[in-house]
Amino acid sequence: MAFALPSSLVSVCNKSFIKPSSLTPSTLRFHKLSFIDQSLSNMYIPCAFFYPKVQQRLEDSKNSDELSHIAHLLQTSLSQTLVSYYPYAGKLKDNATVDCNDMGAEFLSVRIKCSMSEILDHPHASLAESIVLPKDLPWANNCEGGNLLVVQVSKFDCGGIAISVCFSHKIGDGCSLLNFLNDWSSVTRDRTTTTLVPSPRFVGDSVFSTQKYGSLITPQILSDLNQCVQKRLIFPTDKLDALRAKVAEESGVKNPTRAEVVSALLFKCATKASSSMLPSKLVHFLNIRTMIKPRLPRNAIGNLSSIFSIEATNMQDMELPTLVRNLRKEVEVAYKKDQVEQNELILEVVESMREGKLPFENMDGYKNVYTCSNLCKYPYYTVDFGWGRPERVCLGNGPSKNAFFLKDYKAGQGVEARVMLHKQQMSEFERNEELLEFIA
């Protein structure tokens, strides 16, 4: 299959807007965005799920057009789910408010003229996978009035399907997305059960109010896809265990986590591949739902995050045991902080505003700032719409460089990393011998 012309493989069969199955009460018409929500650009979080074996679930149908039946099934369950996730059926009124007007979510049905294996086995799979995401949409700046949720179901010639979701980052983070996907897939599986009602808790501005710092203007992050590339790396369980054991022995850190050792290794290798190595910084995003008092439930919807970071100013700082030791120290410090009053992410946003910069842009003169989003232990591979677990879960190729995304590899204890770097840096990064030792 020639990947050079992916658009020729795609034909859009249907485009519609899915409204909530019941009207949103007037008391919930306006959803207030928090300070962290407002600090984010209007980009989507794009992800896709590949299901190679999809069987007809509409027993009473004899129509041969399976795509239309799959789409109808997903549209019906999405409509029911949007009753609880009503802000995603609305539109941005401004950078502080979502108008929950039941405008609906956009839904696309697409045919792809190749087999799923041609995409999953493609030598540049992280690029090929984007064929199942809405064209030109992933990571795009969603202007005010645009759709806050876009879904695409793609059917391959082999009979498999992919379900992709572009989920507004303005309203929720990766944990929020997983809550939505679990609820939507549960409603789809149990469509005969009318008592299954999702119960997300929209936090809004109740935790991070704008009263202290004032409202924000929407930041614009310009996409740099022409210069940045994504690489998919698999750290299998046996090699990851060996890496963890090696780091534990050399660092003195007890039971280093998968995320600690993998992010440290990626940071080290990416920094070495950079033309301007040091000083460099690694910023980890941190889910603070369980760190806030009183604790927030797992089904809390919003951007509920903070950050912690480590720095490397000389070559000794770049040794793997040192990096992991510093990561463990900083995360322990983060857990002792009041994540409302001492939230490092908010402090970074405020400081950036004062200097007229974007967050993490040239932080304190560092040559390179890398960010890491750790989704390990977030069970994306258990999202089951009725066709079993997905063969692969992917993230759309990102708009900017120097980003690491970590998640579980399928249902095991391995790690799948999505690394986004500048093209020239990536060519050096992927040849690093220490990295090659621990990936599949």
Curated annotation (Swiss-Prot):
GO terms for molecular function: aminoacyltransferase activity. InterPro entries: CAT-like_dom_sf (IPR023213). It is an enzyme of class 2 (transferase). It holds the Pfam family Transferase. Keywords: Acyltransferase, Transferase. The keyword Nucleus does not apply. Induction: Induced by wounding and heat. One of its GO terms (biological process) is alkaloid biosynthetic process. Plants silencing PUN1 exhibit low levels of caspaicinoids in mature fruits compared to wild type plants. PANTHER family: ACYLTRANSFERASE PUN1, F21J9.9. This is Acyltransferase Pun1.
